[in-house]
Amino acid sequence: MLDLVEVNQQITKMATEDHLIADDMAERLALAVERLHLESARWQAFVDKLAMSKTSWLVATINEPPNRTYSLPRRPEMVTVVAADGSQIMPSHHEVVPAFLLNIATVVLHYGNGGGAAFASTPSLFYRDEDLYLDYGGERVQVTGDLLGLRRTLMEFGSLIEQAVAARNGGDAVCALSDGSLILWQLEGRPPDYQESMLTDYLACLEQSNRQGIPIIGYISRPRSRDVVNALRVGLCPEEAPNYDHCPYERDERPPCAQIEGLTDRRLFASLLKAGERSQVFGSTSRILDRYGAHRIGFFYLHVGSEIVRIELPQWASTNAALLDLVHAVAYDQAQKGMGYPVALAEAHQQAVVRGAERDLFYDMVTAVFRQRGAVMAVSPKNLRKRRMTV
């Protein structure tokens, strides 16, 4: 039971500190905007400095003046938007059997020529030993947490591409929308055999999308990334070739690069972009992308009216002017139709989500079926207590 008086005191303290942080961030933002325009005026020298620098941060790669903006292109009258999302019932040793369920939903929205929509969700139950465990760096480990999340991501992508390819056969332009990053950063630091297994299937989806001319959009709402700000931090360093393993300013109270530390790209581009406009396409230096080949992921920031979002897309789409314009126009249009968030993704989420009551019903069904077959099944006292709490 919460002590609301104590909580209120802590909230008041938090709000006071947040106000002070906001004032500090405003100063950092002003400096970052100034630096952005300065480096844009000499952007080729800036690119050279970034190439010579060595940092421990993700630093955006730049191909043109970083303050360049692009106006909203016209969306094709005939276009199909496909989205996928998923949710899961996690495995639990407190339940009657070790099993997990993945529910993958797809949404297909046709615009123009009468429109139309198709919604589907497909539950998949995993219970065999080969489902619940995998070989991971020479060990056999249980599929749970991030490992389960990655499996779900691959299933979402497979369903997304399958539906997008089917829609492409109609002849209209097609965009495939995914909620979140296209960069599988979760694979960094994982065993090589596991990386290879996950990337093989993932990149096969991207390759199929490429062959069909279907751009995949990774839509990130309220992004916390700092790739572009980190590039500006390198620009603030007086050194010609900054090496942050041997920084001559690390003992300073406030090193030059720390002047805009903590600022997000979202705040930076909120001061630059107008509604409908996007930034240039930046490159990511995430190490896992070295394994992506022709599908290396780039990103741009887009002002959708209510917020700045990060849009990720494969290199083959970002270097194709027609596909890049299609991604720009569709991402913005979807956000408008969804009152700030893509309507296709919102619908896919609604189709995919497994609610608490459904989870309990799922395990009740499992228990009932096993008991019908004469099995002796038992939920742990802990879980039984949670389900039927009394005082």
Residue locations for each model-derived region?
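Long, contiguous domain-sized segments
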Residues: 1-69, 73-74, 145-174, 180-391
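Short hydrophobic beta-strand that contains or immediately precedes a catalytic carboxylate
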Residues: 81-84
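Short, glycine/charge-rich beta-strand/loop segments that flank catalytic centers
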Residues: 86, 178
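Acidic, metal-ligating active-site segments
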Residues: 89-139
